[in-house]
Amino acid sequence: AVFFIALTTTLVSLPWARRAAFALDFVDVPAQRKVHRTPMPLLGGAAIFLGAIVAVLIIYRGDPEPTVIGVLLATTVVALTGLIDDYRPLPAWAKLGGQFLGFLILVAFGIRVRLPLPEPVDYAITLLWLLGITNAVNFLDNMDGLSAGISAVTTSFILLLALTNNQFLVAALAAALLGACLG
């Protein structure tokens, strides 16, 4: 259900996001490193964010686990940082700072990579990994839909791994992101 809610929400919100982006002149203009030749709307990520968040909120309405609250808060901080950066490019330190703040929220909710290492090392690895993955996906964002497509492929594998390991919360969150990316 979470997959289809995210997919549908994103499909419904994308045309609105596209119109709003052009109306607000919230577009990426062609440049030398860009593949597109015409202005591209910059609110597609907001539609994907909305699809995933709405799906998670509907599925976990009422009494969500603290982990879900942490993921929602962190995702919101990172998404807002990206949205602000799309509107008015932020200096690298500010963009990293917003991402770092979002990922600190995850860590504060106890979300971390669990390795046979001291806990502080696990948290440091978690922060570095999340910053690295986020910026790697951000670097792919020079062609319309490329980031969403690659994110959908990787999220599919996360979903499969979570299901085979009975990690149903991770599976639900991955299904929400997958549905949103495919929308």
Could you say what each language-model-derived stretch is?
Residues 1-183:
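"…together with the soluble PPM/PP2C metallo-phosphatase catalytic core" -> "…together
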